[in-house]
From Swiss-Prot:
<feature type="domain" description="5'-3' exonuclease">
    <location>
        <begin position="171"/>
        <end position="262"/>
    </location>
</feature>
<keyword id="KW-0378">Hydrolase</keyword>
<comment type="function">
    <text>5'-3' exonuclease acting preferentially on double-stranded DNA.</text>
</comment>
<dbReference type="InterPro" id="IPR029060">
    <property type="entry name" value="PIN-like_dom_sf"/>
</dbReference>
<keyword id="KW-0238">DNA-binding</keyword>
<dbReference type="InterPro" id="IPR036279">
    <property type="entry name" value="5-3_exonuclease_C_sf"/>
</dbReference>
<keyword id="KW-0540">Nuclease</keyword>
<dbReference type="InterPro" id="IPR008918">
    <property type="entry name" value="HhH2"/>
</dbReference>
<dbReference type="GO" id="GO:0017108">
    <property type="term" value="F:5'-flap endonuclease activity"/>
</dbReference>
<dbReference type="InterPro" id="IPR038969">
    <property type="entry name" value="FEN"/>
</dbReference>
<dbReference type="GO" id="GO:0008409">
    <property type="term" value="F:5'-3' exonuclease activity"/>
</dbReference>
<dbReference type="Pfam" id="PF02739">
    <property type="entry name" value="5_3_exonuc_N"/>
</dbReference>
<dbReference type="InterPro" id="IPR020045">
    <property type="entry name" value="DNA_polI_H3TH"/>
</dbReference>
<keyword id="KW-0269">Exonuclease</keyword>
<protein>
    <recommendedName>
        <fullName>5'-3' exonuclease</fullName>
        <ecNumber>3.1.11.-</ecNumber>
    </recommendedName>
</protein>
<dbReference type="GO" id="GO:0003677">
    <property type="term" value="F:DNA binding"/>
</dbReference>
<dbReference type="InterPro" id="IPR020046">
    <property type="entry name" value="5-3_exonucl_a-hlix_arch_N"/>
</dbReference>
């Protein structure tokens, strides 16, 4: 089954890594982590689709191996522990299920899921509405007039261009500069020493961009002498970091619109194949949701 529509359509782009992790840690409330994670993963997608009713979907994942960021910066995410065997098995099972039912998903070797989402967003945002499901702050740089981000299944707390400054005291196009100055401990990236998040926001509110901070450094009275020296000392690091945290919007992936139309293929043969994951119940729910009168295409 496939959904198609008017020129302006809704794209649902899901950060698959985030959703698997979230489902996994919530699953500890239940007895069977493996089965519960798979169930929660697909239940979340069902809820989002019901609330958003998108015409198009893509679930983006990181692929195995390093990325161009690791090539540039050996310290990038180096502090993160390796996946536990149980989690890795669940991750692979979810990927297999998605492939088996033909729900649009994947990644691109050498790039992160964020880059894939950025590429799809850049391609389609001018004439469509893009809804990104993630809690990854790197994706905030993509917010635009037709681009929204949420991690709420009910879509009640959308981050949009209208409420962005209220939430972050920055504009979306300042996010990469903010991270370049303040660093990002979650990715093991050190910014300009001694500035911090509050200092980074103050600088960007006064000077708008990293480059304008450097251009104004010797003439402005809005930066203390001590802070000026910190900025001089950290200039090269900040410029380097900006390259690392800027999402690549040109991942060489296929971008024909029809490839993103919601379509699934769930039949008895596929269900039997996937019975090893005890996923029949939630997949039947998924199929039923997509075939209901409210969401029929």
């Amino acid at each position: 089954m496939t959904k198609s529509g008017s020129k302006s359509e809704k794209f649902l782009l899901i950060d698959g890594n985030y959703l698997v992790h979230r489902s996994y840690y919530v699953s500890f409330k239940f007895k069977n982590n493996f089965r519960s994670t798979i169930y929660l993963f697909f239940q979340t997608i069902i809820k989002i689709i019901k609330n958003l009713n998108p015409e198009n979907i893509f679930i983006a994942f990181d692929e195995e191996g390093g990325t161009w960021r690791h090539d540039l910066c050996k310290e990038y995410k180096s502090q993160r522990s390796k996946m536990e065997d149980e989690f890795w098995n669940i991750f692979k099972a979810i990927r297999e299920i998605l492939d088996s039912i033909n729900l649009n998903s994947g990644g691109f070797r050498g790039h992160e899921a964020d880059d894939v989402i950025a590429t799809i967003t850049s391609k389609f945002k001018d004439e469509n509405q893009i809804y990104i499901f993630s809690r990854d702050k790197d994706l905030l740089q993509l917010i635009d007039k037709n681009v929204y981000i949420t991690h709420d299944n009910e879509l009640k707390n959308l981050i949009s261009i209208e409420n962005f400054y209220q939430n972050f005291q920055l504009e979306p196009d300042q996010i990469v500069d903010f991270k370049a100055i303040a660093g990002d401990s979650s990715d093991n990236l050190k910014g300009i020493a001694g500035i911090g998040e509050k200092g980074a926001k103050n600088l960007l509110n006064n000077f708008k961009s990293l480059e304008k901070i450097f251009d104004s450094l010797e003439s402005t009275n809005l930066i203390s002498k001590a802070q000026k020296q910190k900025i001089r000392d950290g200039k090269e690091q900040a410029l380097f970091l900006k390259k690392i945290v800027t999402l690549n919007k040109e991942v060489p992936m296929k971008l024909e619109k029809e490839l993103f139309a919601i379509k699934i293929n769930i039949n008895e043969e596929i269900l039997e194949k996937l019975d090893k994951y005890d996923s029949r119940y939630v997949l039947k729910q998924f199929e039923k949701a997509l075939e209901s009168d409210d969401y029929l295409w």
